[in-house]
């Protein structure tokens, strides 16, 4: 796992995401979720490739049940792109690296 990925908790979400400057991609995931495990290596690569433009963060919804309902998370993996503390874009489900890069490039422009 990339050392560039931030591991969030319900307690740290406010500071690490909502009060942070710039763009942050938050992956809402769980240990038992197969598609979540499929995109984990892709997120590691994205964290490296987009360093300086984007911060990648992960929130385990089983260990941190308070945050996901605030954002209407119903299925996982769900990726929320935050810009300066506001949700700028959402993607639900596993994506290929190409699809994720298209999503990010379109929303970071």
Swiss-Prot record:
GO terms for cellular component: cytoplasm; cytosol. The record marks 34-35 as: Contributes to redox potential value. One of its GO terms (biological process) is cell redox homeostasis. The modification N6-acetyllysine is found at residue 70. Keywords: Acetylation, Disulfide bond, Electron transport, Host-virus interaction, Redox-active center, Transport. The active site is at 33 (nucleophile), 36 (nucleophile). It holds the Pfam family Thioredoxin. The keyword Transport applies. Residues 2-109 form the Thioredoxin domain. Belongs to the thioredoxin family. This is Thioredoxin 1. It comes from Escherichia coli (strain K12).
């Amino acid at each position: 796992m990339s050392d560039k990925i931030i591991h969030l908790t319900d307690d740290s979400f406010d500071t690490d995401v909502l009060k942070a400057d710039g763009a942050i991609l938050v992956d809402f995931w769980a240990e038992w979720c197969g598609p979540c495990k499929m995109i984990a290596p892709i997120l590691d690569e994205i964290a490296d490739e987009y360093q300086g433009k984007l911060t990648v963060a992960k929130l385990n919804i089983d260990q941190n049940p308070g945050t996901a309902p605030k954002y209407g998370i119903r299925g996982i993996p769900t990726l929320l792109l935050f810009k300066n503390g506001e949700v700028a874009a959402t993607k639900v489900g596993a994506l290929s690296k190409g699809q994720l890069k298209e999503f990010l490039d379109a929303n970071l422009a």
